[in-house]
């Protein structure tokens, strides 16, 4: 249980407090001595104690006031020694009342700092913080009794002026920095994507990326050499005029155009190697390309998948777009076309069913899926030439169920020159199954291909004479069709059929690529391998008969 203090205990505690000495605030502020020695002295300082303290400070300097008792034997605490030195014994200490200048400085410092006596004493040498505090407290009481303001009006006006000056200096500095930024052109307006798009649409020569796309450039380079060159020149001119607006974009497009030019040169060399070359007109000095599956005005090349000599026509030649295109696809995207490997023979036959033959007075209403419109003009022209003029004998072959609707081939006057040259080199019948200038490789005895017939091509033997002639300067490159062979698929006449991975054996494809990558591809084409065996695989058998007619320019 807690013991309750009795009245006798309280009286004893009170008596002890009365008997204990009272500390002098002015002379001592330290704690009583806790050791076994004599207690610390309190009260006013004597002259002997002042002399001991001054001598110690001169020897050891100010600081470490607690060591004075140990080193000098002075029975005073450290706090009492410090206050005696600072307030009474310092050599630079000022005695007496404050001057008018010191009073004005104290008022100004107090208006700025407040009750920071030690900081104010640093601005008043020889004056202690205690003296400054006593002066300020005495002044406040006097002003309150007189009803005067604590700070005079002059000090208040000076303080307000200083505040306004500081604010004005800050504003001037901020305005100066803004002026410098504007003078140096460093003003950065707000930028949004909407404004950029609106400004780019208003540019006079801001080209779109689609205008110089890879597919368009490739399609133009395969369609016409002059068309590709002029388009690239126009696009380059537009890019040069827009260099000041979009320099980074023009550099990128120029790099694309240069890479496409290099690809066009490589593709030209490849076309010459596989017989995909220009057709030389007898009455024209320009080269007009006839791509696979298509034809030009006045030409009868590749009507039914077989090569025939072209006939010069009267009147200007009209450059047409290549007919190697689907009605549902982009004309310039034929490189992306691939043959679906899962199609059955019946699916390949259906789109190419032959329509009834048209009369000479009425154009045929049938249109090939690849030749929309252009094939009808060729049929109409062939019928007109056959009925109106007495030219060479037209050879009409029976069409297979996989061939295109038109199977009529007209022999041109250059056909006689080719026939004479072939008879000089190879005596014998001219129109045979190995003649490269025959208008149609299939005769009437060729049986039609049914829907279930397999598309298998065998290796055919060639005679030494033929192999020797094929190894000469006038190289002939074309497939040999045996009477039992089937007709190739029309879609395999497309240029991309050479590169389809699902139509040829890998070894045959590698041999074909090795032949294409040989030296001087445009002149020296070596189709004969080994002991006079020519590959009639699906990829090379699908190629039409082609021949370089450089001597008949």
Curated annotation (Swiss-Prot):
The gene is GAMYB. Residues 1-17 have a biased composition (Basic and acidic residues). Residues 65-89, 117-140 bind DNA. It is found in: Nucleus. GO terms for molecular function: DNA binding. Its main location: nucleus. Residues 27-38 have a biased composition (Gly residues). GO terms for biological process: anther development; cell differentiation; pollen development; regulation of DNA-templated transcription. Coiled coil: none annotated. GO terms for cellular component: nucleus. SMART domains: SANT. This is Transcription factor GAMYB. Interacts with MYBS1. Induction: By gibberellin in aleurone cells. Keywords: Activator, Developmental protein, Differentiation, DNA-binding, Flowering, Nucleus, Repeat, Transcription, Transcription regulation. Pfam families: Myb_DNA-binding. Residues 37-89, 90-144 form the HTH myb-type domain. Expressed in aleurone cells, inflorescence shoot apical region, stamen primordia, and tapetum cells of the anther. Expressed at low level in roots and vegetative shoots.
């Amino acid at each position: 249980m807690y013991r309750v203090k009795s009245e006798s205990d309280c009286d004893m505690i009170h008596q002890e407090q009365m008997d204990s000495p009272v500390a002098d605030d002015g002379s001592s502020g330290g704690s009583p001595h806790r050791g076994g020695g004599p207690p610390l002295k309190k009260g006013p300082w004597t002259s002997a104690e002042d002399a001991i303290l001054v001598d110690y400070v001169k020897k050891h300097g100010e600081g470490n006031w607690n060591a004075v008792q140990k080193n000098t034997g002075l029975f005073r605490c450290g706090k009492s020694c410090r206050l005696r030195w600072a307030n009474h014994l310092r050599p630079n200490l000022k005695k007496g009342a404050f001057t008018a200048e010191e009073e004005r400085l104290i008022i100004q410092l107090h208006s700025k700092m407040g009750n920071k006596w030690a900081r104010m004493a640093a601005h008043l040498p020889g004056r202690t913080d205690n003296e400054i505090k006593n002066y300020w407290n005495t002044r406040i009481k006097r002003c309150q009794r007189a009803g005067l303001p604590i700070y005079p009006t002059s000090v208040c006006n000076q303080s307000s002026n200083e505040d306004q000056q500081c604010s004005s200096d800050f504003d001037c500095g901020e305005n100066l920095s803004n002026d410098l930024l504007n003078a140096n052109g460093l003003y950065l307006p707000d930028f949004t994507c909407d404004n950029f798009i609106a400004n780019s649409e208003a540019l006079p020569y801001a080209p779109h990326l689609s205008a110089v796309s890879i597919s368009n450039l490739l399609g133009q380079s395969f369609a016409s050499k002059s068309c590709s060159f002029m388009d690239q020149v126009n696009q380059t001119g537009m890019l040069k005029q827009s260099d000041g607006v979009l320099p980074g974009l023009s550099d990128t497009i120029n790099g694309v155009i240069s890479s496409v030019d290099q690809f066009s040169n490589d593709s030209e060399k490849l076309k010459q190697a596989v017989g995909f070359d220009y057709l030389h007109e007898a009455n024209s000095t320009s080269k007009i390309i006839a791509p696979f599956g298509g034809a030009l005005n006045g030409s009868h090349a590749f009507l039914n998948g077989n090569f025939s000599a072209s006939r010069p026509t009267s009147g200007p030649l009209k450059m047409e777009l290549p007919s190697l295109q689907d009605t549902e696809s982009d004309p310039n995207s034929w490189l992306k076309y691939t043959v679906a490997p899962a199609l059955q023979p019946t699916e390949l036959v259906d789109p190419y069913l032959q329509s009834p033959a048209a009369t000479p007075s009425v154009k045929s209403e049938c249109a090939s899926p690849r030749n929309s419109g252009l094939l009808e003009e060729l049929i109409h022209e062939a019928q007109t030439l056959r009925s109106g003029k007495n030219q060479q004998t037209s050879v009409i072959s029976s069409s297979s169920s996989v061939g295109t609707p038109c199977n009529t081939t007209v022999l041109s006057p250059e056909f006689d020159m080719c026939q004479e040259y072939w008879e000089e080199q190879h005596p014998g019948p001219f129109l045979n199954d190995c003649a490269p200038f025959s208008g149609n490789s299939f005769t009437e005895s060729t049986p039609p291909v049914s829907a279930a017939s397999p598309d298998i091509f065998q290796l055919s033997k060639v005679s030494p004479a033929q192999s020797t002639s094929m190894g000469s300067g006038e190289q002939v490159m074309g497939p040999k069709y045996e009477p039992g062979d089937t007709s190739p698929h029309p879609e395999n006449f497309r240029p991309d059929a050479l590169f389809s991975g699902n139509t040829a054996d890998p070894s045959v494809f590698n041999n074909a690529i090795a032949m294409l990558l040989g030296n001087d591809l445009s002149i020296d084409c070596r189709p004969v391998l080994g002991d006079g065996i020519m590959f009639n695989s699906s990829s090379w058998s699908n190629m039409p008969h082609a021949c370089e007619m450089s001597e008949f320019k």
